[in-house]
């Protein structure tokens, strides 16, 4: 399966369920994504460590400084904490969930639980990354998880891990896509033409916006395999 074909399949699935069900479908698929993501990566760790001879084997193959929590430097650590604290908590994929909660208490409780889970789960892909560095020196960071899964895990488990990676992408992509369509519909279309449009018409505009933005996102993904350099 080529990268381009995989992009087309994932992009089409993302656009279809976001456009057809809106916030409801995004939320329901997020529940599935959560279990696939957490389950896939969590199951991967014991399989991978067993196949490389245990954690002690990984440690002996890595320089001591590679295992330190402050290897990148405190300046970078503090900068990343501030950046992610400000962006993750205010991003569309988070804000949508806050406003979709049944009340303020649920929104606060949900965000706290999410933060705890993310803090604990952060160690799982880090372990896989260290295994990749120990077993495949010089490997590119973007290929670490895929390389470990395909070379150190049974085919079924490797497929589960790759599905977890795709789940993370789809979860963020659906929220961002729906957020952009909502901003366009509420702040532009409804603001200027709201009095003359019915709810059904606004919904139609929102779905068309999801489709249009989804197509643009797919095209960008096919043209450029890295989005961050395009933003800076």
Show the residue positions of the predicted features.
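Membrane-embedded helix-loop-helix hairpins and adjacent transmembrane boundary segments
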Residues: 1-232
């Amino acid at each position: 399966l080529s990268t381009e074909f995989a992009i087309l399949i994932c992009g089409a699935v993302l656009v279809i369920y976001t456009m057809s069900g809106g916030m409801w479908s995004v939320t329901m698929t997020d529940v599935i994504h959560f279990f696939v993501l957490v389950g896939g990566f969590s199951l991967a760790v014991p399989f991978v460590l067993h196949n490389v001879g245990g954690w002690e084997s990984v440690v002996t193959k890595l320089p001591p400084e590679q295992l330190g929590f402050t290897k990148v430097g405190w300046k970078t650590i503090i900068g990343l904490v501030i950046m992610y604290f400000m962006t993750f908590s205010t991003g569309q994929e988070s804000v949508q969930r806050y406003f979709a909660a049944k009340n303020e208490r649920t929104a606060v409780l949900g965000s706290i639980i999410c933060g705890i889970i993310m803090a604990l789960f952060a160690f799982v892909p880090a372990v896989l990354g260290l295994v990749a560095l120990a077993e495949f020196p010089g490997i590119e960071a973007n290929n670490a998880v895929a390389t470990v899964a395909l070379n150190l895990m049974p085919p079924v488990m490797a497929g589960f891990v790759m599905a977890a990676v795709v789940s993370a992408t789809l979860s963020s992509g659906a929220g961002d896509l729906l957020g952009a369509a909502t901003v366009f519909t509420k702040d532009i279309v409804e603001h200027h033409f709201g009095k003359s449009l019915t709810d059904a018409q606004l919904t139609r505009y929102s779905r068309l916006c999801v489709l249009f933005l989804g197509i643009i996102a797919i095209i960008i993904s096919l043209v450029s395999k890295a989005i961050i350099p395009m933003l800076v």
